[in-house]
Amino acid sequence: MNILFVINDAPYGTEKAYNALRMAMMLQKEQTDIVEVRIFLLADAVTCALPNQSTPQGYYNIERMLRAIINKGGQVKACGTCSEARGIKGLALLEGVEISSMSQLAQWTVEADKTLVF
């Protein structure tokens, strides 16, 4: 089963990115043989892909969560237009995260058995 997570919020300030990644990690842990996880970072969520961020007190480390998902075979892409609008398109991203496009998001959506939007 192919599950697509579309995340829209910044890594810190709300718990949307955290909850999306927590769900993705749980699916990878408990449904290893039947689930393929894909994550598309959209809008302010593209900043989730920046390495070495300071984790605010009381929050979980989003970088660590993304790395765990990637290390278990999850695919993570960040919207190029959103990255450019936020001035991060030329910056180094977490290893395994690729700048992508709405065309890719459309393709992933068509291929997904389920799409979850946070």
Q: Where are the model-predicted features located?
A:
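Primarily the HKD phosphodiesterase
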Residues: 34, 39, 48-51
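C-terminal structural segments of small proteins and small subunits
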Residues: 85-118
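A glycine-rich helix N-cap at a beta->alpha junction
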Residues: 55-81
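Short, glycine-rich nucleotide/cofactor-binding loops
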Residues: 4-20, 49-54
